[in-house]
Amino acid sequence: MRQPNRKRKLSLESTERMNQDRCTGQTEEEKKPGEVTTPSKRESSVTTAETWSWEQYLREGNAVAAPVELFSKDQSFPEHENGFQVGMRLEGIDARRPSVFCVLSVAEVCGYRLRLHFDGYLSCYDFWTNAGSPDIHPVGWCQKTKHELHIPRDYRKDKFVWMDYLKACRLQNAPKKLFRNRSSNGPVPREFQVGMKLEAVDRRNPCLMCVATIADIVEDRVRVHFDSLDDSFDYWCDVNSPYIQPVGWCQENGRTLVAPQGYPHPDKFSWTDYLRASQSKAVPAKAFGMRTPHGFLPNMKLEAVDKRNPQLIRVATIADVDDYRVKIHFDGWDHKYDYWVDADSQDIHPIGWCDVTGHPLEVPYGSKHVKILPGQPACPTPGCRGIGHIRGPRYAGHHSAFGCPYSDVNLKREAALQDRLREQTQANLELDPSHSKSENPCNLNVNGKCENANSQCRLVQQAKCLKIKGKEDIDLDNLFRVLVFHPRRLEYSAAQVQQMLHQPLSMTSTSAHPFRDIPLSREQHCKLLPGVADIQASQVARWTVDEVAEFVQSLLGCEEHAKCFKKEQIDGKAFLLLTQADIVKVMRIKLGPALKIYNSILMFRNSQDVTEDASSQEDKR
């Protein structure tokens, strides 16, 4: 595909025309769970009274576009058109689990981008990527390269054969020629070998430099795994990445190296002792390359994927830069939506990329050229036109702040991608990042694996402070005193019941199992909310929208509010993630019923811990 003439007029009008031919996908606000999109023409997201063009926009704002030369081959204009079609099967990396290769299908095609669907799973786990992504491979790649293929749910691993699967389901595999538009820095140096140790930046917590292992090597990239953590923290990078450094780099540069969980005396970590104990070798320092700093400058214009709504690409400005990253600001939007991204990310492109590839471009908010299409769902968030949903691709649109990816109630929530392999629903609580979740650190395995399933704790200190949704610290001791239950008092007036239900149920404590210290508090709430007893979070997570509404209707005094949950299409997983603010401020339910519903949610969230704790105590006896 050719690069556009710099004098050519780049307009939304041509984008819409190309979009009519190349974009396929559903237009309904709600998509059916697990449904794969069939080809259909997708309406442009905007209409224009006049033609919007980059040329005019740059001239009027006296702005400058980021030069095409600053973009890598993966970011710049593709050499070939996107030949993928809806329904084609392929293999690829799970965006949430970088170690897992899965059976994928093309659910939607838009310009040079794909929405990929995990066969056998709900569409809420779908994710977007470019057609030239190094994370996708043709059918049979895993078998050829000896990688394990994570097969569709309900299929037996020893019985799954690609050709039989395609034939039985009358499916088509994506031709190998479609996987050709890739850049490569050449093969990984032979000095890099699987199992070797190094020091690496934790991409989720960039201030941390941690002990890590080379877990896999594919073509020109390596997979970095953090010793003692699960593979959801892994990431792929090339050997020139600034995120990986040789053993001893932290000591030489005065940086703190985070030892693996469970390592004795982490403040006295010794690479010599650790390598000997793990019977491993360090990656030779000479094998590491040095990436040249990018040439991006503040105020340069470009086109960027909206990470809160990944189906959209917006007109953007570089707000700030550091050595290897740029800060993206969407023109016309509040700076609270700005975010940092690697300078070589496939989510940023030169101006005109959308026009050339046939992808819709979201023009700046407040532009006089933008008009809302008739019938488009209304959203109260300024700038949002009802496109996308905080719960990901399962819903094509929203009409309230509850589902809006940009609303204040969702601003601190991670949008779009959900981990389909993590069965246990995570409680909507955040520990202070300077503390761990548990008083018992993960048991260290010298091969870099974590023997404790709860491996998200990053430091070894005991949790003493709890933060809920980024708000003020809670005095746990005072909270527990409020929750003490007097067993002799077996009868309560209606007012007393309401008063007790208005008291929040503690989610955690300084111990790993909170209810060990306050067993009567749970007993109290079970008596006041009998419908909650013996129901675990894993069961609630499987509830449908109707089942959630039915449960809310069963709560005394909450009958009339069941329709709110049905209207917002809240299923079991979404129900478990609700906060008190969501129920009161977004769904506009009065405080009394809201607290009763929220306490039920807290009971559900903690039921699993209580059951496991009881089983553990029984085993010890």
From Swiss-Prot:
Residues 543-607 form the SAM domain. It comes from the Eukaryota. SUPFAM superfamilies: SAM/Pointed domain (SSF47769), Tudor/PWWP/MBT (SSF63748). Pfam families: MBT, SAM_1, zf-C2HC. A zinc finger (CCHHC-type) spans 370-414. Keywords: Chromatin regulator, Metal-binding, Nucleus, Repeat, Transcription, Transcription regulation, Zinc, Zinc-finger. Residues 1-48 are annotated as: Disordered. MBT repeats lie at residues 52-152, 160-260, 269-364. Residues 10-20, 28-44 have a biased composition (Basic and acidic residues). It comes from Mus musculus (Mouse). Putative Polycomb group (PcG) protein. PcG proteins maintain the transcriptionally repressive state of genes, probably via a modification of chromatin, rendering it heritably changed in its expressibility. This is Lethal(3)malignant brain tumor-like protein 4. GO terms for molecular function: zinc ion binding. The lineage of its organism: Eukaryota, Metazoa, Chordata, Craniata, Vertebrata.
